[in-house]
């Protein structure tokens, strides 16, 4: 199955998701534009509503009620994809990652939910800030889009 997310906002781009079967990892590829230099939190959020500056997307997708964590942590939200690194606003930020927790199949599917790129670095739940265990203290929302099925 394949899915696409058209990211819009201060940051924009296209992100593609591909998963061959429910028990296989999801390949995440694409690009983002206009990202300030540095690391930016990158998460699937619970709702496919991208209005109000992406705030209507809700919290990180967390159907299993876990603490926030790194993509490779034993405990994490389903939507915790870590960080993307940008070389600066004039550079294209290429996205190439794989994730074993998100899925395009079944009741925990990310289809119809939103993808959000944040203003700040995700501390992966390891920081001292009170928001570390829920959002990774990753700040505001630079861009977002709805994850939808695309043609093969």
Swiss-Prot record:
Example of a GO MF term: copper ion binding
Gene3D superfamilies, alphabetized: Superoxide dismutase, copper/zinc binding domain
Disulphide connectivity of cysteines: 54-144
Cofactor note: Binds 1 copper ion per subunit. Binds 1 zinc ion per subunit.
Taxonomic superkingdom: Viruses
PROSITE patterns reported for this sequence: SOD_CU_ZN_1, SOD_CU_ZN_2
SUPFAM superfamilies for the chain: Cu,Zn superoxide dismutase-like (SSF49329)
Catalytic activity: 2 superoxide + 2 H(+) = H2O2 + O2
Reported cofactor(s): Cu cation; Zn(2+)
Residues noted as binding Cu cation in the record, renumbered to the chain: 43, 45, 60, 118
Keywords attached to this entry: Antioxidant, Copper, Disulfide bond, Late protein, Metal-binding, Oxidoreductase, Zinc
Family affiliation: Belongs to the Cu-Zn superoxide dismutase family.
Function field: Destroys radicals which are normally produced within the cells and which are toxic to biological systems.
PANTHER family per UniProt: SUPEROXIDE DISMUTASE CU-ZN -RELATED
Protein name per the record: Putative superoxide dismutase [Cu-Zn]
Organism of derivation: Orgyia pseudotsugata multicapsid polyhedrosis virus (OpMNPV)
Gene name, Swiss-Prot/TrEMBL: SOD
């Amino acid at each position: 199955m394949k899915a696409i997310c058209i990211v819009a906002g201060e940051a924009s781009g296209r992100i593609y998701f591909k998963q061959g079967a429910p028990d296989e990892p999801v390949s995440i590829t694409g690009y983002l534009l206009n990202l300030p230099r540095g690391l930016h939190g990158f998460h699937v959020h619970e709702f496919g509503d991208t209005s109000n500056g992406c705030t209507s997307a809700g919290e990180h997708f967390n159907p299993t009620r876990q603490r926030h964590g790194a993509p490779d942590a034993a405990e994490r939200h389903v939507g915790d994809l870590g960080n993307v690194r940008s070389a600066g606003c004039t550079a294209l930020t290429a996205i190439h990652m794989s994730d074993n927790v998100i899925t395009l199949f079944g009741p925990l599917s990310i289809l119809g939910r939103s993808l959000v790129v944040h203003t700040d670095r995700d501390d992966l739940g390891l920081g001292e800030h009170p928001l570390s265990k829920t959002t990774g203290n990753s700040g505001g929302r630079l861009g977002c889009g709805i994850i939808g099925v695309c043609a093969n």
